[in-house]
């Protein structure tokens, strides 16, 4: 695609007197995976609804696949595949029938729809489940079927709303492998997720929003270097406040989340020496990651 597949410029949305999206601007480049991150209530769902033309913005401009939204949202959606947060597969149909029926919504002939099914089943690794009812599938199988269904129109853009929520680690990794294969085919992906590892593995760039405003944007590694820039020691114990007071002089910065104290350090040795042999304490020394960035930017954990 020669134009930006997704472009938001100074978009605002109000519900009653509450501004839920506040001057949001970002664009997604062709062939990239772009992550939209934020806590519950940050405005992610409203942003996706406006992108798809389901909800109309009060100010700003949106384009999807080169089409202005909402005025030509219906045309734009012909080139978009959507994986919703919650599966909305038809439980009365088999796996094969779910794909066939959805293909007809895009105007495909019965012959063309039937021709699509085998490669989509292969992509989703569901060949052996073609004639199974949806209720017979595992959670991971349902998510892969929903992803395959989103591909029936060979979309330029995929919009994925928390695609691996509720999946076990094995199913999540298989879903990630399928998404990477789509990126290798040149698909553009807009992804919302509560899993920082997922965002770090898949996203070329990401945008963190809070209360409808963009508070950070960039490549995952760039954000980690810019916002954290050092190692992290996680300390689990009964009195994190007391630990913070004791260890703060030896850290660049400290944060408390629940019962965990995070110490951001350039030199970990002084803290290691003070923790060694302490009863009732567990600690982990690791490189900084996107979860640390989120904690730094918002002051709280991501919530499911």
UniProtKB/Swiss-Prot annotation:
* GO molecular function terms noted in the UniProt entry: ATP binding; ATP hydrolysis activity; transmembrane transporter activity
GO CC annotations, alphabetized = plasma membrane
- Cystine connections: none
Quick one: where is this thing mainly located?
Answer: membrane
Coiled coil start-end:
none
**Which of the seven top EC classes does this enzyme belong to?**
translocase
Q: What superkingdom does the record give?
A: Bacteria
What EC designation does it have? 7.6.2.-
How this chain sits in the membrane, per its record, is:
Peripheral membrane protein
Cross-referenced Pfam families:
ABC_tran
- State the function annotated in the UniProt record: Part of the ABC transporter complex NodIJ involved in the export of the nodulation factors (Nod factors), the bacterial signal molecules that induce symbiosis and subsequent nodulation induction. Nod factors are LCO (lipo-chitin oligosaccharide), a modified beta-1,4-linked N-acetylglucosamine oligosaccharide. This subunit is responsible for energy coupling to the transport system.
Family, according to the entry, reads as follows: Belongs to the ABC transporter superfamily. Lipooligosaccharide exporter (TC 3.A.1.102) family.
Q: How does it assemble?
A: The complex is composed of two ATP-binding proteins (NodI) and two transmembrane proteins (NodJ).
Q: How is this protein named in the record?
A: Nod factor export ATP-binding protein I
Task: Give the originating organism.
Answer: Burkholderia mallei (strain ATCC 23344)
Question: Organism classification, top ranks?
Answer: Bacteria, Pseudomonadati, Pseudomonadota, Betaproteobacteria, Burkholderiales
């Amino acid at each position: 695609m020669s134009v930006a597949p997704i472009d938001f410029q100074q978009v605002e949305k109000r519900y009653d007197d509450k501004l839920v999206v506040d001057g949001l601007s970002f664009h997604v480049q062709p062939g990239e995976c772009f992550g939209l991150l934020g806590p519950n209530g940050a405005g992610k769902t409203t942003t996706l609804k406006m992108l798809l033309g389901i909800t109309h913005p009060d100010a700003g401009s949106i384009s999807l696949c080169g089409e202005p939204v909402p005025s030509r949202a219906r045309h734009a959606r012909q080139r978009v595949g959507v994986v919703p947060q919650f599966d909305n597969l038809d439980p009365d149909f088999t796996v094969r029938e779910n794909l066939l029926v959805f293909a007809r919504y895009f105007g495909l002939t019965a012959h063309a729809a039937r021709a699509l099914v085998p490669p989509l089943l292969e992509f989703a690794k569901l060949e052996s489940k073609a004639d199974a009812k949806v209720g017979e599938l595992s959670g991971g199988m349902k998510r892969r079927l929903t992803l395959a269904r989103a591909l029936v129109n060979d979309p330029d853009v995929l919009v994925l709303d928390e695609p691996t929520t509720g999946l076990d680690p094995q199913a999540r990794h298989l879903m990630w492998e399928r998404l990477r294969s789509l990126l290798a085919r040149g698909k553009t992906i807009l992804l919302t997720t509560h899993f920082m590892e997922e965002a770090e593995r898949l996203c070329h760039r990401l945008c963190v929003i809070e209360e409808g405003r963009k508070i950070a944007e960039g490549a995952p590694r760039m954000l980690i270097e810019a916002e954290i820039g050092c190692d992290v020691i996680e300390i689990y114990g009964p009195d994190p406040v007391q630990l913070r007071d004791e260890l703060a002089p030896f850290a660049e910065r400290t944060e408390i989340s629940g019962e965990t104290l995070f110490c951001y350090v350039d030199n970990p040795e002084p803290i290691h020496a003070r923790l060694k042999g302490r009863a009732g304490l567990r600690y982990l020394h690791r490189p900084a990651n996107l979860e640390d960035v989120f904690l730094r930017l918002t002051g709280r954990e991501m919530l499911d």
